[in-house]
Each structure stands twice: as structure tokens, then as C-alpha cells.
């Protein structure tokens, strides 16, 4: 029989590695969130999760959406259910949006511009989420 904690630790490790290998910086403390969010420019925040729609839709969309002429200056991630304090601090910036994971938040100069919430991810194809993110990049980001 598989040890559940061992299994979940492996799932979490793989989820972390997948988003970091896509070029996102992990924010694991409230202080790291503060530091990242006070930077000028645009920041895409991927709220990571261990749910199926995170692995099958959100993380692939996070990886592929940034291959676009206009993209955010900064790519960061917090992990809901794992780095709880960092995630809670990040969500304080997402005014007007209820907590959801997985999700994406686009910030400009530390202020929320828009979000792609779980209900816009779950049940959708990765390409639909990529297209939505890239439309936000087109409106709010500059060519890098």
C-alpha cells in the first residue's frame, strides 16, 4: 500500500518543479510576496494547486502563455494549501476577487488588473486559458 503522505509530497514536489521550470519564481513567505509585488511593471501570479485542473490545464497554460510578443515583466507563483501564509498575503492584493485555486492574477505596479479564476480554468482546454491570458498581456503588457 502506498503511503498517502509520501504520495502527496511527491505530487506537491512535481507541481512546484513544473511551474519553476516554466520560468516562474516561487514565493513561499509573505515577505517574498511583498517584495515581488512592490516591483514596477506587470506581474503574472499563478496560484498553484494540487488539483487535477492545475496539472492538466493551469500549469501548462502558465508555461505556454508567456511565449508571446507581449508578456508580463515578472512571473511568480504561490502554492495554495502549501505555502498558506504567502498565498494569504498574495490574495490580499486580489481585491474584488474571491480566493480560488488554481488561478492567475495580473498585477500592474502592485495593483490588481484582472484575474483568471478557477471557474475559467476548470472544464476548459489549456488553449482557451492561454488565449485569455494572452489577451490580457496584449492589453496590459509591453514587448519584452
UniProtKB/Swiss-Prot annotation:
BP-aspect Gene Ontology terms: cell redox homeostasis
One Pfam family recorded for the sequence: Disulph_isomer
Record InterPro entries: BrxB/BrxA (IPR009474)
Domain of life: Bacteria
PANTHER family linked: BACILLIREDOXIN BRXB, UPF0403 PROTEIN YQIW-RELATED
Family, per entry: Belongs to the bacilliredoxin family.
UniProt protein name: Bacilliredoxin BC_4151
Species per Swiss-Prot/TrEMBL record: Bacillus cereus (strain ATCC 14579 / DSM 31 / CCUG 7414 / JCM 2152 / NBRC 15305 / NCIMB 9373 / NCTC 2599 / NRRL B-3711)
